[in-house]
């Protein structure tokens, strides 16, 4: 059964035991999966990679049938999944799981994907596509962020930030965090320093990049 990404607040894990999130928009997937988890904080969270499950399917089976006084209710997240996981999902479907919920996190799945088709046709399981964000959505997210943090930026700077995010809110949030760190000491965002800020390498901690690299560059100008 297909539902829209904005409908995740309607998900009831007691009824919808297995959910597929798929798509290229990693930021949206993370956000929506977090929403589901936060609505079920009483459940124990377990994370696996598809390779782990394929190498040892008993990982999932044991979690389904093993009961503990402390973690009867569980949410199992299986990441980086492909069509290879389908047989295990079909096996799980044959068992009536009660206290376990499973979230499947996949990258983009083509229409011919057997995994996607299985979830789309199912009456019991949910399928939530997470398509790339458009410019309008990213602009709203960025504006809301700056408004909440009370950071003043021009429309031109806002456009610059959004344009480099490749239609993915995860990229946007990374850039917004850089800016938040930068202005924490009373520094102002300008056309000149925003280009330096958003082009900093991603393989360092954001705070380290902003506080060290950018600060040094600005002192030289």
PLM region spans:
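Conserved beta/loop motifs at nucleotide-recognition and modification sites
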Residues: 1-220
């Amino acid at each position: 059964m297909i539902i829209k990404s904005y409908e995740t607040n309607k998900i009831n894990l007691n009824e919808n035991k297995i959910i597929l999130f798929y798509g290229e928009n990693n930021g949206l997937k993370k956000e929506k999966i977090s929403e589901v988890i936060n609505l079920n904080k009483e459940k124990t969270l377990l994370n696996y990679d598809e390779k782990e499950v394929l190498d040892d399917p008993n990982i999932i089976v044991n979690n389904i049938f093993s009961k503990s006084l402390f973690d009867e209710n569980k949410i199992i997240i299986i990441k980086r999944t492909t069509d290879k996981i389908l047989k295990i999902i079909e096996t799980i479907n044959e068992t009536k799981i009660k206290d376990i919920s499973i979230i499947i996190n996949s990258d983009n799945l083509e229409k011919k994907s057997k995994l996607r088709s299985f979830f789309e046709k199912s009456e019991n399981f949910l399928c939530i596509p997470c398509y790339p964000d458009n410019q309008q959505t990213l602009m709203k997210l960025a504006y809301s962020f700056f408004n909440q943090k009370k950071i003043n930026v021009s429309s031109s700077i806002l456009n610059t930030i959004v344009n480099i995010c490749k239609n993915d809110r995860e990229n946007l949030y990374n850039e917004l965090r850089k800016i938040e760190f930068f202005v924490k000491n009373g520094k102002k965002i300008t056309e000149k320093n925003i280009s330096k800020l958003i082009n900093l390498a991603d393989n360092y901690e954001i705070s380290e990049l902003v506080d060290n690299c950018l600060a040094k560059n600005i002192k030289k100008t």
